[in-house]
């Protein structure tokens, strides 16, 4: 039996799609030096090569892929989007606007200078910024504005060609820029990070190892009574001195949870809750021959919960104002927009921030009720909310405006992005509404993106050889300019106009470019994770602005003429 693989793939679009995805994902794992190609560029290269051989898939798959991707981008941005937009994140908002607008202006200017069409220009912008949201926004707007089928097909082919040619240029140049720009600017990022650390009471070099607190019980002897000197627990401040807190006291056979007025007496048996290293550092007056093993004292359930910040008495307040240790709880991590932040007592909490808190179950529940809610640890997605807001996004995308003789539609990209932001925002405020496990959200987003890239590459592959011959070197040079010049502009704006700390500034610049590999290099250069504060500040808003940039560049292009 002879099987013609080409005929098999041509006759089965689903099989072709998954073959492209599998080969592209394998290619994406390859490295050029320290730079990994990545899934997006791997799938795009494979689909372009197969597209040259006249393989194709139904455009409905491409459209569904981009819709799923952009909707999930909105859901991820939603919890922190409005807090960044309206509050003290104005510096980060301005940096993101400067980055995206300067890149768009440069792309428009270079496109007109070299006589390219809007497809090549928008593709070059998307690739240089290593931003799939730009590609998605531009592709959707092209389908709205170009009514002639031949012109639309050519523009879409050029869009994917421009992206494919400049993506690696944008990624590699930004990674090298992250490594060498601080040195060229004579910026001492470790010193800048230490300055922020001193101002905010952080240890910039620490890599926190997270443990569950442990419970140990001790009998109060003369040494401990002498150490306490008749002070009550509030006055002693045991947590500040030991890193542990007293959860229970047994006195004269009676077990109780002490309040701040309790005074230690000889013969008391106390249970202490704290991290293992805190127990190891206890003063000998606690430990020497005094440890006891009592089921009632030790029988407590220690939990580690993810608490979502929601309530007004926590939002826009400093972390230190929560006084978690006064409530017998320990803070392990602070997560914002899926980015782990340095544990900074002066950090201002945003709605939707996730605090990883451990302690005795009852105390953790009390803290959660006070500041927000415990995140649902469920693998079940609220598909009804997902579908309802997806439909809402499509309906919003149908809205059109008319200015004189010019019609402008919001489009599916902007509509779905807005609906996704609203779903993410509502999820951060209502614990039982619209729940989507992070793993499921990431999977749908990545799958949608890969399907979109496969469709784009297959449709554009037939014209890639001609396009390379006409624009190859010019496109690479233009991509390098659009990749690096906005980074320099952002640095000058942040340093001289906003007067930002350099460690935070470089982190914010990488967030505005939504480039995690470059962020890792900045953190390594600073020998600290403090730049993550800046990265988180610009990341969510930049994803939204980049999608809008893809839409705007297509709308502005015919207005410029030429």
UniProtKB/Swiss-Prot annotation:
Has UniProt tagged this entry with the keyword Transmembrane helix? yes
Q: Specify the protein's topology with respect to the membrane.
A: Multi-pass membrane protein
Transmembrane stretches, start-end: 8-28, 32-52, 66-86, 94-114, 158-178, 383-403, 406-426, 440-460, 473-493, 503-523, 540-560
The answer to whether the entry has keyword tRNA processing is no
GO CC annotation, single: plasma membrane
Task: List each coiled-coil range.
Answer: none
Compartment(s):
Cell membrane
The domain of life for this entry's organism is: Bacteria
Q: Which keywords has UniProt assigned to this entry?
A: Cell membrane, Membrane, Repeat, Transmembrane, Transmembrane helix, Transport
Main subcellular location: membrane
One biological process term from GO is: potassium ion transport
The UniProt entry, under Pfam families, shows: Asp-Al_Ex, TrkA_C
**Span of the signal peptide:** none
Q: Where is the RCK C-terminal domain?
A: 202-288, 290-373
Similarity comment text for this entry: Belongs to the AAE transporter (TC 2.A.81) family. YbjL subfamily.
What name appears for this protein in its UniProt entry? Putative transport protein ETA_21820
């Amino acid at each position: 039996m002879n099987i013609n693989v080409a005929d098999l793939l041509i006759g089965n679009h689903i099989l072709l799609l998954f073959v492209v995805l599998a080969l592209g994902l394998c290619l994406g794992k390859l490295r050029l030096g320290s730079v990994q190609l990545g899934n997006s560029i791997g799938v795009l290269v494979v689909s372009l090569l197969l597209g040259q051989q006249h393989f194709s898939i139904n455009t409905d798959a491409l459209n569904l892929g981009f819709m799923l991707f952009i909707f999930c981008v909105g859901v991820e941005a939603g919890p922190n989007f409005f807090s960044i937009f309206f509050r003290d994140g104005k510096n980060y908002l301005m940096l993101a606007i400067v980055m995206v607008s300067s890149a768009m202006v440069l792309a428009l200017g270079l496109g007109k200078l070299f006589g390219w069409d809007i497809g090549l220009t928008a593709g070059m912008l998307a690739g240089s910024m290593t931003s799939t949201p730009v590609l998605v926004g531009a592709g959707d707007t092209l389908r709205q504005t170009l009514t002639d089928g031949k012109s639309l097909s050519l523009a879409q082919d050029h869009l994917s060609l421009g992206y494919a040619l400049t993506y690696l240029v944008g990624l590699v140049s930004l990674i090298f820029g992250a490594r060498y720009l601080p040195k060229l600017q004579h910026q001492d990022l470790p010193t800048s990070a230490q300055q922020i650390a001193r101002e905010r009471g952080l240890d910039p070099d620490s890599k926190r190892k997270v443990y569950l607190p442990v419970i140990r019980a001790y009998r109060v002897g003369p040494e401990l009574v002498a150490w306490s000197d008749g002070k009550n627990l509030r006055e002693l401040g045991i947590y500040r001195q030991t890193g542990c807190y007293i959860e229970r006291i047994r006195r004269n056979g009676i077990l109780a949870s002490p309040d701040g007025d309790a005074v230690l007496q000889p013969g008391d048996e106390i249970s202490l809750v704290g991290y293992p290293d805190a127990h190891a550092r206890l003063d000998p007056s606690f430990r020497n021959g005094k440890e006891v093993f009592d089921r009632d004292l030790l029988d407590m359930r220690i939990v580690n919960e993810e608490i979502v910040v929601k309530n007004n008495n926590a939002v826009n307040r400093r972390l230190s104002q929560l006084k978690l240790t006064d409530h017998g709880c320990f803070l392990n991590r602070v997560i914002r927009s899926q980015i782990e932040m340095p544990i900074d007592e002066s950090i201002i909490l945003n709605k939707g921030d996730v605090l990883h808190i451990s302690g005795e179950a009852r105390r953790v529940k009390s803290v959660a009720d006070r500041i927000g809610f415990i995140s649902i640890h469920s693998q079940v997605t609220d598909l009804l909310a997902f579908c309802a807001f997806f439909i809402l996004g499509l309906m919003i995308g149908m809205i059109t405006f008319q200015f004189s003789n010019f019609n402008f539609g919001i489009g599916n990209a902007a509509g779905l992005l807005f609906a996704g932001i609203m779903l993410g925002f509502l999820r951060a405020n209502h614990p039982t509404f619209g729940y989507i496990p992070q793993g499921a959200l990431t999977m749908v987003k990545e799958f949608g993106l890969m399907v979109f890239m496969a469709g784009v590459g297959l449709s554009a592959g037939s014209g890639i050889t001609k396009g390379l011959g006409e624009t190859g070197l010019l496109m690479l040079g233009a991509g390098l300019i659009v990749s690096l010049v906005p980074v320099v502009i952002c640095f000058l704006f942040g340093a001289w106009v906003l007067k930002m700390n350099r460690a935070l500034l470089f982190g914010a610049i990488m967030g505005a470019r939504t480039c995690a590999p470059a962020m890792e290099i900045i953190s390594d250069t600073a020998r600290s994770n403090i730049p993550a504060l800046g990265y988180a500040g610009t990341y969510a808003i930049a994803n939204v602005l980049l999608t809008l940039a893809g839409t705007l560049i297509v709308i502005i292009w015919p207005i410029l003429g030429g």
